[in-house]
Design a protein with these regions (language model features):
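Signature of the first transmembrane helix
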Residues: 14-72, 112, 136
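Membrane-interface alpha-helices at helix entry/exit sites of multi-pass transporters
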Residues: 52, 85-99
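A helix-boundary/kink motif common to multi-pass secondary transporters
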Residues: 45-49, 80, 84, 155
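Short, Lys/Arg-rich, polar N-terminal cytosolic tail immediately upstream
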Residues: 1-17
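Hydrophobic alpha-helical interface/terminus motif in multipass membrane transporters
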Residues: 41, 75-79, 118-119, 150
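Hydrophobic transmembrane helix module of multi-pass membrane transport proteins
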Residues: 2-4, 100-173
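Hydrophobic alpha-helix/TM-entry signal in multi-pass membrane transporters
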Residues: 15-23, 57, 96, 129, ...
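Helix-loop junctions and terminal segments of transmembrane helices
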Residues: 68-84, 152
């Protein structure tokens, strides 16, 4: 590399990759919101009363990333690849949405079949917690698709907004 090439490369380089700051802010907001959610919930319901919600939380965050994070990542990767080639992303979207719907449907059917047992054995007979788990699955599936679409199109501020809203909405609910 000639001296001119190296000086041009160093001048054009940003100190951090595009989107780093906005995603960091979104993650920070989500983290603080999660802490607030647990703090308020435990104070309002007491440690024993909050236990079913904590159980639901851990079940949801074992299922959701396990099933929907790969969809988010593949959506992002495929869209970024097509964007680099100057191609549209509609073919990716047409494949990802039905796939996510089938996975979500399978999870909802499994939860429906296990609802009574889950309510009795995991959520201390609180059926509202079982419904909350169902609601979480219904909302996190499209959220992961939206995150994949945002990051794949290089719209990291939208990605960060989704992450931040995830936490703040949880506190509000």
């Amino acid at each position: 590399m000639s001296p001119e090439d190296s000086s041009t490369a160093s001048v054009s380089r940003a100190p951090v990759p595009e989107g780093t700051i906005s995603v960091a802010v979104g993650l920070f907001v989500n983290g603080i919101s999660t802490y607030i959610f647990f703090k308020i919930g435990q104070q309002a319901l007491g440690q024993d009363g909050f236990k079913p919600i904590v159980t639901m939380w851990f079940i949801a965050f074992a299922l959701v990333p396990g099933f929907f994070l790969p969809i988010e990542q593949e959506t992002s990767r495929a869209l970024a690849h097509r964007r680099a080639l100057g191609q549209g992303g509609l073919p990716i979207i047409k494949r990802i949405i039905p796939l996510a719907a089938v996975i979500l449907g399978g999870l909802l059917i499994a939860l429906a079949l296990a609802a009574r047992s889950a309510t009795d054995n995991l959520f201390e007979t609180n059926s509202a917690v079982t419904l909350a788990l169902l609601f979480m699955l219904l909302t996190y599936a499209p959220m992961h698709i939206a995150r994949g679409l945002s990051s794949g199109q290089g719209k990291f501020s939208n990605y960060a907004l989704i992450i931040g809203l995830d936490g703040t909405i949880r506190v509000g609910v």
